[in-house]
């Protein structure tokens, strides 16, 4: 990834069966309207990987991205995977995740600030991830 796009920015295009092609691939942790919208934004032969449903389990989309752009939607089942498979996945992640500038999408806060930022996180108004350092 070379950039981070905010949820709010993506959701401005919600409801469009096809949007401007912006992504070759997407890893979606939200599901729901956010996943439906990024599907409409995939380039031809693009791939979306669904790995969560924090934004909802429904998928309000059309078949247009699938038949007009040939996009694929893959699901990740982490719940029933054996521990050895999970360990292999985490090892792969650790090997390849160092290539991404995580500091650009991560806000590290001490535990003492968690209550203060919680309403912002719940409202979905943060960009990237908020990591709470319980030792700080």
Stretch-by-stretch model annotation:
Residues 9-18, 33-38, 99-112:
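Short, basic, helix/turn surface patches
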Residues 1-33, 91:
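Adenosine-nucleotide cofactor-binding segment
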Residues 33-100, 134-136:
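Glycine-rich phosphate-binding loop and adjacent beta-alpha segment
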Residues 8-9, 29-30, 54, 84, ...:
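Short beta->alpha linker loops
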Residues 24-28, 51-52, 78, 103-107:
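Glycine- and other small-residue-rich loops at beta-strand/loop junctions that grip anionic moieties
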Residues 3-4, 73-75, 108, 129-131:
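Conserved beta-strand scaffold positions in the cores of enzyme catalytic domains, especially
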Residues 85-136:
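C-terminal hydrophobic helical "lid"/dimerization subdomain
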């Amino acid at each position: 990834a070379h950039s981070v796009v905010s949820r709010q920015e993506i959701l401005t295009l919600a409801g469009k069966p096809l949007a401007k092609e912006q992504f070759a691939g997407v890893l979606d942790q939200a599901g729901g309207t956010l996943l439906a919208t990024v599907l409409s934004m995939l380039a031809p032969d693009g791939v979306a990987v669904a790995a969560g449903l924090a934004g909802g389990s429904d998928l309000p989309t059309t078949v247009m991205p699938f038949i007009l752009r040939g996009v694929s939607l893959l699901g990740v089942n982490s719940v029933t995977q054996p521990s050895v498979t999970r360990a292999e996945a985490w090892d792969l992640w650790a090997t390849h995740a160092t290539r991404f500038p995580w500091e650009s999408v991560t806000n590290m806060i001490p535990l003492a600030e968690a209550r203060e930022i919680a309403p912002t996180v719940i409202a979905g108004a943060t960009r990237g991830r908020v990591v709470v350092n319980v030792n700080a």
